[in-house]
Amino acid sequence: MRMWLVSAIALVDILCTSKIEELVENMGKKIEEALPHEFDSAEKEALKKHLKETAGLGTRLMVPCIFHEDRVVASPTTRYQDIDEEEKGYVEKVIALLPRLLWRSVAYIYVFGNDSWVVNLMEEVFETAPFKKSDAVALYKRARGRLGIRLIDLVNRTFRHNIGMLNRFGQRLAQEAEAKIQEISSSLSDEEKRKEEKMLQIIKEYGESLCTKEKQEEIIRAQEIMCDACACIWERDSNRESFVMETYSRHLYLRMIGSSMDVEEPLLSYIDHRGLIDAYEKYKSIDIVAELIKQVFTERGCISDESVNDAVCGVREREEAEKMRGEEERRKKEEESLRNTLELLRMEEKEKSKSRGKKKKGGKKGSGEVTAKMEEEKKDSEEVEESAEAEVSLEEMAVGGARSKERSSKKKSRSKGHRYKVHKRVLRWTKSAERIKAELDEGSEEKWRNKSIEEIEEQKKVHDIIEVCVLLRSLDANRFFVSTNRYMKDGTERWKMVGVGIFEEGGEKKVGKVEVGLYRDKGEGSVIYHLMFKAMDTEKAGKGARSSFGKGDDVEGLEEGAGELSDMSGFEYPKGVRSEIVKGGDAFKIVYRNPKDTSEVLRSLTVLQKAEVL
């Protein structure tokens, strides 16, 4: 039942009626049963907004990617023979669930008040299908040499096979809805009857639409495009990293709610089928659709004219950048080829000169030849030294001037890791709530003014995580964080680094992202201007928060406090007084303690290593 709860709340579109207040109350109670957390009024308003935005009927699409704990054990393009031997048994368990899971993605809808009759009907149609069900495991394992099918091929075949059940399901759904219209209780008020009949009429019409060839072909085509787009995403390292991180964080979220699950099913995500197909038909480019899917999935958005346009611009910008890089590489190769040719000609001329000299001297080594040889060796030595000095100059230029080679070597050994300055707006959160409030009320950021001390204290918990800088400065940072695409705002180049984190307080755990916002200052240094933990339910419920992977931010006026940057070198709170850092192979944990009683743990933040792709 927990998986149905997850499907109903987290990953599917919902059919909801005008009884949105009751729906919020109903769903809120179910969430509170699954989590040790009660909803306050603000969270109920956020849930109400989320339900209104996601209301409607439609089928979902599968994300063709299989996780096992913190590893991707089967990617969109993985063939059975490519799977790690130790993971094959686990993957087979997941694949065995594929026909039912894909059927659920097509057939399941949420009906306000009582969806058990839809669930029962869905299960009945699946179990009593007149044709033989697909043996997905046998199909996936069937291979001749390297000709085994990919995971996306298996998903598409199974999906198309399941479509054969839609006629029967659609007919039964329409019939059941019509019967329930006739059975509407006479004890209901006229307004309640009207709402109930309207909801059931929508379900009836939806069931009838599932019987049409056009609707069935649309469903199949959308899943095929989704699979092709995921394969395209997987080919690019930068796209794959953000896609895997978002998928991994959602799996962690589901695992926390449904901890009793034996296997982790691939994600089902609602994406507008018609919008997806129209975007592909218009541009005939799987690259553009892949960019669109990546944006919609990682930024928790929807397909719209704006998102499609962003995807088109993103692909064109990338293609232009790749074209420029290609031209630059060709130019460098041509220059290198020319240098090599000139060097060969110079060496040939040398040999000819030596040969002529030997003939004139009759094979004797005269003082002139010795002098010429010494001059040649000196010239070669000078060329090598000039080359080395040039390398040192280029190396040192980035850190403020050339130095001797010996000193440069020491400098390089000392500067292993990453160097970041920290903006005043980040350091502010290390202060007391009263001082933070005073600074925010006087500051230029409108959204932070006039906050109560209670609000400041809550925000301090997720913003005062300066210890993360220890990880950011280390050589291990790239194992934990993904860098997003760069963008320009207010004349500065900005980007983000995003990691997966778990925030724990009072026995409650929250899965989310550790966000690091950076910009390039005038001295070409990297400055951290934003640092926080953002829970996934904050992104999902839309509490005025942007996606971690979203392009852009709402931070203005970085010049304020830019003169008070710190490189944070040597920064640590007194050990045992405020926090303790625990470093492990796959996790970086910060434990915050009560300054008055260090045996009391107030909260903790664990940054997890990026999901491993096997």
UniProtKB/Swiss-Prot annotation:
Residues 317-420 are annotated as: Disordered. Residues 382-394 have a biased composition (Acidic residues). Residues 355-364, 408-420 have a biased composition (Basic residues). Residues 317-338, 345-354, 372-381 have a biased composition (Basic and acidic residues). It comes from the Eukaryota. Pfam families: DUF1609, DUF3654. InterPro entries: DUF3654 (IPR022115), UPF0329 (IPR011667). Belongs to the UPF0329 family. This is UPF0329 protein ECU03_0090.
